[in-house]
């Protein structure tokens, strides 16, 4: 069946349509940790503009990109990270208590920026690209608003008091990040040798993630309903403006596992499987994505929220989002 595609405009189509949308939203998150959304508030032309800027930035020579490189010290990521720097296999392995071979790397480079209002961790920008900073800062605030709407829908669907989730993510202290991903062209054999993946299976660290992907596929999510061994299924958006949303670790903690985080990976697109079976030298095309990683305020408690405590001992103890994210990020580099 695959990850459902929901029409956000149903929220305004009357009480029954609204109820059905909210029920379907929660069910998709429980089944897959993911949902696909159409008729949201981000125009297709706006998404395309950010993809164009992303392409320009990643096309800079490596020396230029290193001028605004991220410093991997456990602090929030800011600037450029080269291919292979982030290791998602280690990130997930540490979470589930499994030792991971350090040779497992990601065939991906990325750029991260935080809120323009963040006074604690300054962004690092490519000075050679005119308008890049201004466009991304504006897009950051646009996705901030879309995120608030999705979390408001979840509050309503889960019968939470208004603000239960959104009050943990304030504009003045927003720790969320906007990320541009680039997966360079790579021989299929490189991805089949067992040591390299575009992204290894992992959970995102924040509350929810908003994702736009380019036409080249490869995103796969865990099918929790499949019998037998762990199974992944492709997520295939119909357009680049379709919004993919996934549950991340913090929301799983807040809801005491009522909404588990969505396990996902990026691999060889399914439509190329037949072609590459006979030739490991076939080149997998480059791929781009845009992710808004919604995160709780740094001093917010990421333990189980009282509204989701059932009388039994909560699964997740109190700790700040800053403490949690720092401990997790140090395993990814």
Curated annotation (Swiss-Prot):
Keyword Zinc-finger: no
UniProt-listed InterPro entries: DIOX_N, IPNS-like_FE2OG_OXY, IPNS-like_sf, Iron_ascorbate_oxido_reductase, Oxoglu/Fe-dep_dioxygenase_dom
E.C. number: 1.14.11.-
Function text: 2-oxoglutarate-dependent dioxygenase; part of the gene cluster that mediates the biosynthesis of UCS1025A, a member of the pyrrolizidinone family that acts as a strong telomerase inhibitor and displays potent antibacterial and antitumor properties. These compounds share a hemiaminal-containing pyrrolizidinone core fused with a gamma-lactone, giving a furopyrrolizidine that is connected to a decalin fragment.
Cofactors that this protein relies on: Fe(2+)
Record organism: Acremonium sp
SUPFAM superfamilies found in the cross-reference section: Clavaminate synthase-like (SSF51197)
Binding-site list for 2-oxoglutarate: 287
Protein encoded by which gene: ucsF
Free-text disruption phenotype from the record: Leads to the complete abolishment of all products.
Protein residues bound to Fe cation: 202, 204, 264
UniProt-recorded Gene Ontology molecular function terms: dioxygenase activity; metal ion binding
Domain Fe2OG dioxygenase: 174-296
UniProt-listed GO biological process terms: small molecule biosynthetic process
Keyword field contains Repressor: no
Enzyme class: oxidoreductase
Cofactor binding description: Binds 1 Fe(2+) ion per subunit.
Alphabetical keyword list: Dioxygenase, Iron, Metal-binding, Oxidoreductase
Record-stated family: Belongs to the iron/ascorbate-dependent oxidoreductase family.
Pathway connected to this protein: Mycotoxin biosynthesis
Protein's name in the database: 2-oxoglutarate-dependent dioxygenase ucsF
